[in-house]
């Protein structure tokens, strides 16, 4: 993921969200105006303006719905407006995390956001419970990528990652649960592209 040297955020405009500096060290997330002069408008080949479609700005709603369905009973249903609400929230969350990671790059005068920047941003923004398992995933992913290059690409990175992410590897990394505002305990859900089932970890498979 790359960013321009003069930019204070990375591709935030593509998510329909802008980020501005306050005091040179903080971001404020602001929605774009939904007007004809919005940054989401562009000129087509005929010179007329055409707004970007929602599917071009947000994550595919089918993928969002698939993840949501994994958290409800098989007989449960999800209303369209609920899917659209989560779709927009997820896109804003991506911009939120990326903006914080971008600020770190800006301070260190780097142009590329790496995995450590994302983990640092999540820790800074209060998502500490997810940092350790994601750190482990990032480490295993990089090891799998190195192995792929070493053997000429005969084994894909995700295959190598699937083999190394065992139940034992996650035993001491995942918290038992999260405590919500009402005092209820929630299980931690980890989203991976690995097809190996890990006992005690609920996984979402992406096709």
From Swiss-Prot:
Going by the entry's taxonomy, the superkingdom of the source organism is recorded as Eukaryota
Region feature (Subunit association domain (SAD)): 86-97
PTM characteristics: Monoubiquitination at Lys-140 plays an important role in transcriptional activation by allowing the deposition of histone H3 methylations as well as histone H2B monoubiquitination at 'Lys-121'.
Positions of region (C domain)? 143-207
Give the matching Gene3D superfamilies: Histone, subunit A
Which keywords label this protein? Activator, DNA-binding, Isopeptide bond, Nucleus, Transcription, Transcription regulation, Ubl conjugation
Xref: CDD domains: HFD_NFYB
Kindly list any coiled-coil regions of this protein. none
Q: Does the keyword Ubl conjugation apply?
A: yes
Q: Where is this region: Disordered?
A: 27-52
* Record-linked PANTHER family: CCAAT-BINDING TRANSCRIPTION FACTOR-RELATED, NUCLEAR TRANSCRIPTION FACTOR Y SUBUNIT BETA
Q: Into which family does the record put it?
A: Belongs to the NFYB/HAP3 subunit family.
Query: What's its job?
Result: Component of the sequence-specific heterotrimeric transcription factor (NF-Y) which specifically recognizes a 5'-CCAAT-3' box motif found in the promoters of its target genes. NF-Y can function as both an activator and a repressor, depending on its interacting cofactors.
Q: Which protein is depicted?
A: Nuclear transcription factor Y subunit beta
């Amino acid at each position: 993921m790359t960013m321009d040297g003069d930019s204070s955020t990375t591709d935030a405009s593509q998510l329909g969200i802008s980020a501005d500096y306050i005091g040179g060290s903080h971001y404020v997330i602001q929605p774009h105006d939904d007007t004809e002069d919005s940054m989401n408008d562009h000129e087509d080949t005929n010179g007329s303006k055409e707004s970007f479609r929602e599917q071009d700005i947000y994550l595919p709603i089918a993928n969002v719905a698939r993840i949501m369905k994994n958290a409800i009973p098989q007989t449960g249903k999800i209303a369209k407006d609920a899917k659209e609400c989560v779709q927009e929230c997820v896109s804003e969350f991506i911009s939120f995390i990326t903006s914080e990671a971008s600020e770190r790059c800006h301070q260190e005068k780097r142009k590329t956001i790496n995995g450590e920047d994302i983990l640092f941003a999540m820790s800074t923004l209060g998502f500490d419970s997810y940092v350790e398992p994601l750190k482990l995933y990032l480490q295993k992913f990089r090891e799998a990528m190195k192995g792929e290059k070493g053997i000429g690409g005969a084994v894909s990175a995700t295959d190598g990652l699937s083999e190394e992410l065992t139940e034992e590897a996650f035993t001491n990394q995942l918290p038992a649960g999260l405590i919500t505002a009402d005092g209820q305990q929630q299980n931690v859900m980890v989203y991976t592209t690995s097809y190996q089932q890990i006992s005690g970890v609920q996984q979402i498979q992406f096709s």
